[in-house]
């Protein structure tokens, strides 16, 4: 990547395993990866203030997310609101703030970290799946709205990663998910991060959904 000019990159949810791996995969770039304690993506005032202090943003990686698992009838509205606010509203707020800078620059790239759950649904994750599905429509709308300003927006599905985010998944379920992969193994945060770092510099692609694991869908 040394042949490319350095980028100013913002990664939300900076305390997570994937965010740290992405930051490590971008050596030579200026990376801002604030954890939730420094940037609560649900807070409009906090988000706008954070981005207003930055001289430029070449790449926004909207990675902040959480899940509250359980059958729909057992989910409280507080659970549902928190999942939607973090995964979807947070992406809206950060994208809106970043685009204001990117339009002035006449260049920028937004990568929304989605999930396979947003394409196929997942038992016990209705709120999470709904939020991640929303990212696809949101991201493709942004791509259409701001393509004329040379601002790109793509959605990345990193696949199932064994991180602290998924540490609660029972071993039996892990085995079932692993069997869905034609390679018989999960992505690592480092594998996903290398792909995301590569995508970050693509200047000719927008409005696409990139799947990074080895699960196959019909008509892909």
What feature does the model see in each segment?
Residues 95, 131, 139:
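Active-site helix of classical SDR
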Residues 115:
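Residue(s) in the substrate-gating loop at a strand-loop-helix junction
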Residues 71-72, 79-84, 166, 177:
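Substrate-binding pocket helix/loop in short-chain dehydrogenase/reductase
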Residues 120, 206-220:
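Short C-terminal tail/terminal secondary-structure segment
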Residues 147, 152, 205-207:
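Short, small/polar-rich loop/turn modules that mediate ligand/substrate recognition or access, typified
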Residues 100, 144-148:
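Alpha-helical segment proximal to the catalytic Tyr-Lys
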Residues 92, 185-212:
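C-terminal substrate-recognition "lid" of short-chain dehydrogenase/reductases
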């Amino acid at each position: 990547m040394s042949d490319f000019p350095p980028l100013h990159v913002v990664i939300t949810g900076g305390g997570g395993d994937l965010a740290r791996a992405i930051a490590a995969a971008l050596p030579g770039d200026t990376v801002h990866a604030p954890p939730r304690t420094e940037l609560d993506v649900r807070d409009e005032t906090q988000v706008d203030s954070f981005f207003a202090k930055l001289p430029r943003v070449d790449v926004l990686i909207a990675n902040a997310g959480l899940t509250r698992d359980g059958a729909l009838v057992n989910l409280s509205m507080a659970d549902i609101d928190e999942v939607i606010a973090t995964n979807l509203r947070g992406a809206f707020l950060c994208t809106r703030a970043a685009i204001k800078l990117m339009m002035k620059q006449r260049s920028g790239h937004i990568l929304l970290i989605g999930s396979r759950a947003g394409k196929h649904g997942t038992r016990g994750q209705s709120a999470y799946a709904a939020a991640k599905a929303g990212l696809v429509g949101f991201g493709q709308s942004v791509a259409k709205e701001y393509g004329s300003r040379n601002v790109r927006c793509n959605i990345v599905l990193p696949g199932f990663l064994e991180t602290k985010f998924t540490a609660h998944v029972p071993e039996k379920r892990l085995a079932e998910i692993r069997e869905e992969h034609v390679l018989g193994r999960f992505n690592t945060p480092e594998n996903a991060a290398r792909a995301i770092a590569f995508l970050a510099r693509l200047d000719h692609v927008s409005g696409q959904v990139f799947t990074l694991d080895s699960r196959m869908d019909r008509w892909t």
